[in-house]
């Protein structure tokens, strides 16, 4: 997220600069160790708290530089853009973000390094919200080669009407979203094959008790959800 005092400087949670995280959290060393053991990382920008960079950094060049500094420091091959709250309907920041990320992605491609880009967005049992559909469309329009859309499959109901079957609600959200994503690409002149549609989707449930009382996503739900893509064409 953005540094609270310097809106075009990336930070970890608004509390640590990249250098601070290397010194105080030994983050760079830990990443090196993980990769030496065969693992890798993906950095997610944004989230429920604080300010995503594009929402407060209004200069295109400075915004691209902010994303670039994170991608290059950690030699990232994939990033996630977790867009929530008012950001999801804020057209200026959506368009700025797309331009900046597209710039960095193109630079990486020119250097022979792929940069996968995911969007993480709120969802209901009907799939993406209207704002979510518009955001995905605008991101692609802005030049981003989008790897996929990750649905936040959680908190489906309300205090008065909690969702009793969280697995069914999650599956319904994904079934709806796969059609929405296919429609978005069709509008771009790209016809996704059935085998491609599900590769464009991810899901992030809230394991256990959700924020809505009465909604619990169990370990059995998680096991069942893990095999859903395998059941699709």
Mark where each language-model region is.
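Chitinase-like catalytic core of GlcNAc-active glycosidases
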Residues: 1-188, 192, 196-218
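Short, low-complexity, polybasic intrinsically disordered segments
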Residues: 215-233
């Amino acid at each position: 997220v953005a540094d609270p005092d310097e809106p075009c400087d990336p930070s970890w949670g608004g509390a640590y600069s990249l250098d601070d995280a290397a010194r105080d959290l030994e983050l760079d060393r830990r990443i090196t160790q993980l990769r030496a053991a065969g693992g890798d990382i993906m950095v997610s920008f944004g989230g429920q708290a604080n300010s995503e960079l594009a929402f407060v950094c209004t200069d295109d060049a400075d915004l691209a530089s902010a994303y670039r500094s994170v991608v290059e420091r950690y030699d990232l091959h994939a990033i996630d853009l977790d867009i929530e709250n008012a950001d999801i309907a804020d057209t200026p920041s959506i368009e700025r973000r797309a331009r900046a990320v597209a710039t960095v992605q193109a630079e990486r491609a020119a250097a022979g390094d792929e940069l996968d880009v995911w969007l993480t967005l709120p969802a209901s049992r009907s799939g993406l919200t209207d704002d979510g559909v518009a955001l995905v469309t605008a991101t692609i329009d802005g030049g981003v080669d989008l790897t996929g859309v990750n649905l936040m499959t959680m908190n489906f109901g309300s205090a008065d009407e909690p969702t009793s079957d969280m697995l069914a609600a999650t599956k319904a959200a994904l079934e709806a979203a796969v059609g929405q994503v296919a429609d978005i690409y069709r509008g771009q002149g790209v016809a996704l094959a059935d085998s491609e549609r599900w590769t464009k989707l991810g899901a992030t449930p809230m394991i256990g008790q959700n924020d809505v009382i009465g909604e619990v996503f169990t370990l059995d739900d998680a096991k069942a959800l893990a095999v859903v893509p395998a059941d699709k064409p």
